[in-house]
From Swiss-Prot:
It comes from Streptococcus pyogenes serotype M49 (strain NZ131). It is found in: Cytoplasm. Mg(2+) binds at residues 85, 87, 100, 119. Pfam families: RecU. This is Holliday junction resolvase RecU. The lineage of its organism: Bacteria, Bacillati, Bacillota, Bacilli, Lactobacillales. Its cofactor is Mg(2+). Endonuclease that resolves Holliday junction intermediates in genetic recombination. Cleaves mobile four-strand junctions by introducing symmetrical nicks in paired strands. Promotes annealing of linear ssDNA with homologous dsDNA. Required for DNA repair, homologous recombination and chromosome segregation.
Length: 202
């Protein structure tokens, strides 16, 4: 585990949030993982020229490779070249979009150990440059997904440096429920369109 210096200060969330209606369609019932559903959603947006959003590659340094068979190589040792920031980034209607996706089986909270300081700092930098930054939080047991603006995540993290889990009530109050769909499966751009581009979220 890598420790990073902390230089963020506490902030207070003072925003008005809305929730969208929930649809009963669930990608998990179709055998898809949360990440696969997001990737399929991004493919849908790309194929219809709605947005260009991709999963960021993780830079890895391969150290050792075994060859159990001549036609097959097995990586047995590798290291991350640098700390990752967020999972996805791209552009939508001229706006830079950057977000992280997390999943938990817990019913009452999202573990903050899933978030690292360098990710929080990266999100703060994106917001400083007026980018659209958020996290998609999926509660697999509840079959509920939420769009939480990055500022709400940052503010909660700064209370105790991310040592406590984030209650689902906080997420529901400060975020937006994402209505599952067939195409796309996780229509998070609807949240952006309705509440950030021409909406009343500040």
């Amino acid at each position: 585990m890598v420790n990073y210096p902390h230089n963020l200060i506490r902030q207070k969330v003072s925003s008005v949030q809305k929730q969208t209606k929930q649809n009963k369609v669930d990608f998990a019932n179709r055998g898809m993982s949360f990440e696969a559903a997001i990737n399929a959603t991004n493919d849908y947006y790309l194929s219809r020229q709605i947005a260009v959003i991709h999963k960021k590659p993780t830079p890895v340094q391969i150290v050792k490779v075994d060859y159990p068979k001549r036609s097959r190589a097995k990586i047995v040792e590798a290291y991350f070249r640098q700390a990752s920031t967020t999972d996805y980034c791209g552009v939508y209607k001229g706006h830079y979009v950057d977000f992280e996706a997390k999943e938990t089986r817990q019913k009452t909270a999202m573990p903050m150990k899933n978030f690292h300081l360098h990710q929080i700092e990266h999100m703060a930098c994106v917001l400083h440059q007026k980018g659209i930054c958020f996290v998609l939080l999926h509660f697999s047991t509840l079959k509920e997904t939420y769009y939480l603006p990055a500022q709400a995540l940052i503010s909660f993290y700064q209370i105790d440096n991310g040592s406590k889990s984030m209650p689902i009530d906080y997420i529901r109050k400060n975020g937006f429920k994402v209505a599952f769909g067939a195409f796309p499966q996780v229509p998070y751009l609807n949240i952006i369109e309705q509440n950030f581009l021409g909406g009343d979220y500040n």
